C-alpha cells in the first residue's frame, strides 16, 4: 500500500515574521485613529485522509547548526538538541496560560505542591510512572537530580544559579562544605520535600527548583568522572519516563524516537515513531517541495 507523505518540515523554529513600520511623526488624528490591519495565521493544517498505521512522522528542525547529541533534558544547552529531547520526554509539570506551574495536579508525572507558610515544595511521583527500562521512578531519582545540580565537582554546570542557594543547605553542598543537601528530605518512596529559606514569586515560574527528573543510577555513574560527563549514558542514552525513547541516532543529522512501552499514558501516544532531522535554511524550500 502506498503511504501518504507526511509534512517534511514541522518546527517551532520556523515562523513567518511580519514587520509593520510606522514612518510618520505627524499628529494627524486620522492617522492615529486609522484601524490596524488584522493579520491571522492558521495554527492547524488538515490534509485530510486517515493516518497510516505504523508510519513515521517526519519532524524537521530548521537550523544552520547540527545536533550535538546532548540528550539530557536538564543540561542540554543547544536549542536544536532540546527541540528533540523536549518532545521525547514531554512535560514533567503542567503549566497554565501564564506559564505558571499547576499545583496539586494528580495527573502530572510529578505532582507539585507549594506551602508558602512552611517554605516548602513537595514533589510526589505518580504511582504508575516508570523509566523506559521498566523500573519505577522514585523519590531517589528526584534527590539524585538535585545532588547533581549542586555537585561541587560539576564545574561545567551552566544551569546552576543563585536561585538554588535558597534551598536550605544547597550552598554549603555546592561549596563542598557538606556531603548532603540538608533541606531536601526523602519523605517516602514517592515523595520529596524541599525546604527553602525564602519563597519568591518566581518559584511558580520554575526558578529555584528543577523541572525534570533524571535516573538516579545514571546520575551516579555519570558523577564518577566529570571529565567524561558529556559521554555518559545519562546524556547520550538517557532513560525516559516520557512518551518516547531514542531508538537510533545519526550523529549531527537525525534522531529516530519510538513510543515508550512503559509510558504511564501509552494509550495516548498515537504516533509510534518520529524522525527528527535538522534542515538547513538553504535546503528548506526544496525539502518542502519533495
Regions found by a protein language model. Give the residues of each.
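Sec-dependent N-terminal signal peptides of Gram-positive bacterial secreted proteins and lipoproteins
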Residues: 2-26
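Bacterial lipoprotein signal-peptidase II cleavage site
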Residues: 23-35
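Aromatic- and charge-enriched surface segment that lines or borders ligand/interaction sites
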Residues: 110-160
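Surface-exposed binding/hinge segments that line
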Residues: 159-221
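N-terminal low-complexity, Pro/Thr/Ser-rich intrinsically disordered segments
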Residues: 32-57
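N-terminal lobe/hinge region of extracytoplasmic solute-binding protein
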Residues: 58-116, 239
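Extracellular/periplasmic solute-recognition and catalytic clefts
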Residues: 61, 247-258, 275-290
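Gly/Pro-rich hinge or "lid" segments in bacterial periplasmic/extracellular proteins
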Residues: 208-269, 273
Amino acid at each position: 500500500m502506498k503511504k501518504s507523505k507526511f509534512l517534511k518540515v514541522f518546527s517551532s523554529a520556523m515562523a513567518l515574521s511580519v514587520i509593520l513600520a510606522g514612518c510618520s511623526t505627524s499628529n494627524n488624528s486620522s492617522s492615529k485613529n486609522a484601524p490596524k490591519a488584522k493579520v491571522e495565521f492558521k495554527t492547524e493544517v488538515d490534509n485530510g485522509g486517515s493516518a497510516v498505521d505504523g508510519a513515521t512522522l517526519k519532524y524537521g528542525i530548521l537550523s544552520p547548526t547540527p545536533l550535538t547529541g546532548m540528550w539530557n533534558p536538564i543540561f542540554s544547552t543547544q536549542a536544536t538538541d532540546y527541540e528533540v529531547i523536549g518532545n521525547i520526554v514531554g512535560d514533567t509539570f503542567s503549566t497554565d496560560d501564564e506559564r505558571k506551574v499547576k499545583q496539586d495536579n494528580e495527573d502530572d508525572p510529578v505532582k507539585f505542591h507549594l506551602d508558602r507558610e512552611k517554605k516548602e515544595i513537595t514533589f510526589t511521583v505518580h504511582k504508575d510512572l516508570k523509566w523506559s527500562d521498566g523500573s519505577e521512578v522514585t523519590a531517589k531519582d528526584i534527590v539524585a537530580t538535585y545532588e547533581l545540580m549542586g555537585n561541587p565537582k560539576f564545574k561545567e554546570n551552566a544551569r546552576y544559579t543563585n536561585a538554588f542557594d535558597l534551598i536550605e543547605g544547597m550552598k554549603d553542598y555546592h561549596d563542598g562544605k557538606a556531603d548532603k543537601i540538608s533541606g531536601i528530605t526523602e519523605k517516602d518512596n514517592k515523595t520529596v520535600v524541599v525546604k527553602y529559606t525564602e519563597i519568591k514569586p518566581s518559584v511558580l515560574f520554575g526558578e529555584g527548583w528543577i523541572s525534570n527528573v533524571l535516573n538516579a543510577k545514571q546520575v551516579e555513574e555519570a558523577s564518577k568522572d566529570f571529565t567524561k560527563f558529556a559521554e555518559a549514558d545519562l546524556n547520550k542514552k538517557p532513560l525516559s519516563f516520557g512518551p518516547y525513547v531514542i531508538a537510533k541516532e545519526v550523529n549531527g543529522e537525525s534522531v529516530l524516537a519510538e513510543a515508550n512501552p512503559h509510558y504511564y499514558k501509552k494509550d495516548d501516544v498515537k504516533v509510534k515513531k518520529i524522525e527528527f532531522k535538522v534542515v538547513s535554511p538553504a535546503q528548506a524550500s526544496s525539502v518542502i517541495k519533495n
